[in-house]
Structures are given as C-alpha cells and as structure tokens.
Amino acid sequence: MPARRIVIGIGVSLISICATGANAFALETQKAREIMDAILMQNGISATEMSAENSNGTVIFTYDDVRLDLSGYSSARELVLDDVRVTMNDTDIANQVDIGVTLPERGKMLAEATSDQRELTMRKALGSLRWDHVNGVPVNFTGSADFLIGDEPVTRKHWLMNGLVIRWMPEEARISWQAAEWTGPNREKRGSVKSTSFLLYPGENDETHLDYAHDGLWLPSLLQPRTVRIKSSSTGLPWSEARPILQKGFNDMMTGLAPRAARRQIANDLWQKAADNGAPVKIDEIYVEGRGLEALGKGEFIAQKAARYGFSGQLDVDLIGRERLQDLIGTPQSPTLLGALVPFAVDGLAAGEPGTQGTTNYDVELLRDGRIVVNGITVFSGTSGS
C-alpha cells in the first residue's frame, strides 16, 4: 500500500495523547481516516501513513516522519518521530471516538543551533484521548511516560524525568512527575526534585482549587525550599470559567507550545479572569521546609489591574528557624554580604514577633502600590530596590 501524506494533530507532548478505548460500534477504516485527517489538519503535524489495519472495528494506523513545529521557544524547533502507532475506536456516545497513540523510544528535536537540538528517549510514552469529531475538541485525555530524557549532543546537557502524568478531565487538570534532574555542560548537576504535582479541580460551590506540591528539591544555592505545599481556592474564579482557559492551555501545550509558555498563558488568562471578577484568591495553606527552616501560613490575595505587581493581599506566616536564617542574611545593624543584596529580606526577618511554641510570627501585607509591610513596618517601598 503506497504511503499517504497527511497532517496529524497531536502536539509536542505526543506523549499525552495515546492508547485504548471502548469499542461500542465497528468503525470503518475510511471513516477513521477522515476523522484523523480533520483532527490532524487542525493541529498541523505532517506525517507519512505507513499502514492502516482494521481489527473488529479497531482501526490501527502507523506513521513515520511525524513532524511538528514547536512554538514558544527562543528559536524555531521541530519535533520528529518515526513509528508512531495510533488506534481509534468508536464509543457509545454519538460523535465521540477514543484515540490512542504509542510513541517510539527514540525521537529528535531539530533546530538550527546545535545547542537547541535534543536527542529524545521516551520509555512507555502513551495515553488516551476522547475526541468530539463534530465540534473538533477533546473531551478528555490522559498521558503518561515511565521515563523521558533529552540530551543536547555537543555539551551533553540533559534533563530527565520519571513517572510523567498529564491529565485533562471535565473535573480535573493534573501534571505530575517524579525523580526529575537537569544538568549543565558535561552533566554538571544543576538541580533535581523527587516529585512535583500541579492539580486544579472544582469545589462544592463551583470554586476553583489549585494545589501545588514538590518534595526533595535540590538546587546549587544557599536557600533550599526542599518541600513546598500550597493549597488555594477562589470563589471569584468559578470552575465553569476557569475550565475553558485550562482546556485551551493544555491543548496548546499538546500541540506544540512550549510548556513554560503554556503555563504563562494559563496563568495570565486566569489572572485576567480573577481581576475582572474582583473576588479574592484564598491561600488555604502554604508550607515551606528546607535546611532547618519551616514556615506555615495562610492568607488572601486579590488580582487587581491597578496593583503594581498584579495583586494585593495579606499572608500570616509562622516561622521556625529564624536564627538560622539570620545567620545567613544578618540583621539590619549587621547584614551579611548576602543580606546586603536583599535589605528588604533582612528588615522583614527582623520585624518578626514572638509566636506560639517557639515560632516567629509575620503578618505580611502586599499593598496596591507595591509596598511590603511586615508587622506594621514597611520593609520594601515598591520603588527601585528598597
């Protein structure tokens, strides 16, 4: 059967659109191809169809020379894969099909500059997508990869992560991974983290919840936020309004937008919606631990277009380990070299008041004009440097 040139739409994270579905009705090969053509044209990935099989209504395509232009990077880049396996099944819901992709173990990110090129290794990179082929939108998708690594061929810089999960459901958006590491030239370690998780979901009253956590973070720096947990919610940002923003951001990431650019786009759009609605974002809990320091707090912020930094609000924090941090940055009367670079941090630390059970309490306010006030003392004026 001659190879047939088509356009596929699966994305830089082809990792997250992949594998099985229910076989409610026998799907004809030509119908499946038409659906794929529409999906794939919509997202702009070119590929060569090498084979198409139909096994009791499950249509299986194999593609070589799959190419996707990547956006949101500092220079033009292209993802190239061979031996991509796509399956499609009909479902018991009208106009919806289950689509799956299994990625090969090897791939490439091409770029003009050698320093931007990557050799990719993807172990068990697969997942599932339910697609509404009348409206041309995903209903949900789940993707995973046991192991991902990208190598820069000349300097040998690399990044890797294990246990990647990307999930978009009507009532949940999640990205998580384990045991990630990134290096500089010649594999010089620049950072690592044992686990990271972002989770967005609706509450009982349609409020939007955002939970973030990481554990085991290591950076080559004096300050080490080894463990961080944040739980937040907003009644002023209903899930019914946040969900389309998240869906678009996830879809853009899956179809070639750099993850960093996609995160920025989602954050900006959510901030805009929160600012328009004018309701507070509650920090139900924030916990930070690292190198003998522990901090636990809660607070409330409001997104405001007129605010110098986009928000104003208040955070109440209890700190354990003030003396250790004071050894690092000093006091207003005797700052260390590091403290001299961040005088507002020195003044803020010194403004703490005795709390319960050996803690130091900080009532931190971020004002609309950019000033930071700690326990009634202005430690940062919002102007250049102090």
Regions found by a protein language model. Name each.
Residues 6-7, 18, 176:
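Small/flexible residues
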